[in-house]
């Protein structure tokens, strides 16, 4: 997501844009994120990292894109514990509130997904609750203007994590309590089961939203749409289809 945001900023504003990117991890000598003016390394929850962000461009920002996410996946959203949700929120949601409070920023853009489709309800775990928190925040009035890009399945840390956990669990399909998931792995290799699981997501997305197989180019186009409209709340992208909406996806309506 961060790459798509940077590319869209450069397309819209050219070299005039002054961009800082925060890389969640240890500093690697010689490594810089392409397209930005400054790369900052470290955990966004580290006070020193926040102070460095405040020192950039006199602490004034037109737009902040918050794409960092880390939380438990691979289990049903309904089975996420309060502890796992709190841990997921620590990096996936809570920093958004902190940054909005501490920075002088006009617009904050966060990211979500279609976590209420059947396949995601079965596997998105605590991250599903963090994404719901983001969507509820998106429709609230705040110090900054709020917006959210909601995307269909694409290759990401979360999707890789889900596949890795399912691959391990697939060795004993009887332990998969969800009948839909279990059907993908019974009598099949873990590789084949994962493939069928992904195909199931794509099929469900296409039936629900009109397209599927979201690519890096699609994410880039969604960011360009963000700049095109005056005050969008949700910019949805699923495959080549991009559309606006203004209501959050609430888990209570689907669980």
Write out the residue ranges for each language-model feature:
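Conserved mid-core segment of classical short-chain dehydrogenase/reductases
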Residues: 69-86
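Conserved NAD(P)H cofactor-binding loop of Rossmann-fold oxidoreductase domains
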Residues: 64-74, 112-113
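NAD(P)-cofactor binding segment of oxidoreductase domains
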Residues: 50-55, 82-106
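Conserved catalytic-core motifs of eukaryotic protein kinase domains, centered on the activation segment
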Residues: 32, 74-79, 119-122
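Catalytic loop of short-chain dehydrogenase/reductase
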Residues: 87-89, 107-143, 150-182
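C-terminal helical subdomain
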Residues: 94, 148, 167-251
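Canonical Rossmann dinucleotide-binding motif of NAD(H)/NADP(H)-dependent dehydrogenases/reductases
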Residues: 1-20
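Rossmann-fold cofactor-recognition segment
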Residues: 21-27, 31-49
């Amino acid at each position: 997501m961060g790459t798509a945001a940077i590319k869209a900023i450069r397309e819209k504003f050219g070299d005039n844009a002054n961009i800082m990117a925060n890389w969640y991890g240890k500093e690697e000598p010689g490594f810089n994120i392409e397209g930005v003016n400054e790369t900052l390394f470290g955990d966004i929850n580290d006070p020193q990292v926040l102070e460095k962000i405040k020192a950039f461009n006199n602490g004034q920002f037109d737009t902040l894109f918050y794409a960092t996410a880390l939380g438990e996946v691979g289990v049903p959203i309904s089975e996420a514990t309060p502890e796992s949700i709190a841990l997921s929120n620590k990096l996936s949601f809570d920093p958004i509130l902190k940054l909005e409070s501490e920075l002088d920023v006009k617009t904050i853009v966060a990211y979500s997904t279609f976590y209420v489709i059947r396949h995601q309800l079965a596997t998105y775990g605590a991250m599903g609750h963090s994404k719901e928190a983001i969507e509820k925040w998106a429709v609230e009035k705040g110090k900054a203007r709020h917006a959210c890009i909601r995307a269909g399945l694409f290759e990401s840390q979360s999707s890789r994590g889900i596949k890795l956990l399912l691959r391990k669990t697939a060795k004993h399909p009887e332990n998969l309590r969800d009948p839909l998931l279990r059907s993908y792995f019974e009598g099949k290799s873990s590789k084949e089961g994962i493939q069928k699981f992904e195909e199931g997501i794509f099929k469900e997305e296409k039936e629900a939203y009109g397209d599927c197989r979201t690519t890096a180019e699609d994410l880039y186009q969604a960011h360009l749409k963000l700049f095109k409209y005056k005050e969008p709340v949700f910019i949805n992208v699923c495959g080549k289809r991009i559309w606006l909406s203004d209501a959050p996806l609430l888990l209570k309506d689907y669980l």
